[in-house]
């Protein structure tokens, strides 16, 4: 079966939001729980939904913590977000070659749109599925299934690209092929343990991989 659809995670995959996310967590946690959290303590919070993360910290303050996080994140977004090498050119080429491309993210739509506009990627994506559009987040298959449905694509014709185990396992649960990115903050070995079909060292590695898959 040939691949005609590529789904991407956003944070840490298409755009480098790591410093923004870490700073947003540290600001929020220092505000409510001074001197209790260091940088290394918040690294595991990258990937899960804000609700899941803050529920484990303080069940009684979840919405308050999310509001604080999102306010800081919004205010400092453009100064702390960077593009990854070859992302723009690769997505542009995928569109030129006729691939359907979508984003599946656990972020809220407003922040997603800010990131896509800043990186000038907003012109390319046919479908963007955010946490606002689903009941369940990755690794549950629902977000990927929704994106595939909106794109008119089948799982066996799709590839999911991401920087976290939620993306790889989410793709596996939905029945797509999977590609992990080696620039993940979690480290290459961490993602290799989840057995993605492919490992990308830069986003442009996608192009020869897809070409090979569609030739065989």
From Swiss-Prot:
Pfam families per the UniProt record, alphabetical: HAD_2 (PF13419)
GO biological process, alphabetically ordered: DNA repair
EC number(s) given by UniProt: 3.6.1.1
GO CC annotations, alphabetized: cytosol
Record's keyword annotation contains rRNA-binding: no
InterPro entries membership: HAD-like_hydrolase_sf, HAD-like_sf, HAD-SF_hydro_IA, HAD-SF_hydro_IIIA, HAD_2, HAD_sf, PGP-like_dom2, Pyrophosphatase_Ppax
Entry keyword Transcription regulation: no
Free-text function comment from the UniProt entry: Hydrolyzes pyrophosphate formed during P-Ser-HPr dephosphorylation by HPrK/P. Might play a role in controlling the intracellular pyrophosphate pool.
Name of this protein: Pyrophosphatase PpaX
Gene designation per UniProt: ppaX
């Amino acid at each position: 079966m040939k691949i005609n659809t590529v789904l991407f995670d956003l944070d840490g995959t298409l755009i480098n939001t790591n410093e923004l996310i870490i700073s947003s967590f540290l600001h929020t946690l220092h505000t409510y729980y001074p001197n209790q959290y260091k940088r290394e303590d918040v690294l595991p919070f990258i990937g899960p939904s804000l609700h899941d993360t803050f529920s484990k910290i303080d069940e009684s303050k979840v919405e308050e913590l999310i509001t604080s996080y999102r306010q800081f994140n919004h205010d400092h977004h453009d100064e702390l977000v960077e593009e990854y090498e070859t992302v723009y050119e690769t997505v542009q080429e995928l569109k030129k070659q006729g691939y359907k491309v979508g984003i599946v993210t656990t972020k809220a739509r407003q922040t997603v749109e800010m990131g896509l506009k800043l990186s000038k990627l907003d012109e390319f994506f046919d479908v963007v599925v955010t946490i606002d559009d689903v009941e369940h987040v990755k690794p549950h298959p629902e977000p990927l299934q929704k994106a595939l449905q909106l794109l008119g694509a089948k799982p066996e014709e799709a590839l999911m690209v991401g920087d976290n185990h939620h993306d790889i396992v989410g793709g596996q649960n939905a029945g797509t092929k999977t590609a992990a990115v080696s620039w993940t903050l979690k480290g290459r070995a961490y993602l290799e343990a989840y057995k993605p079909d492919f490992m990308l060292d830069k986003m442009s590695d996608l192009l020869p991989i897809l070409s090979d898959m569609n030739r065989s």
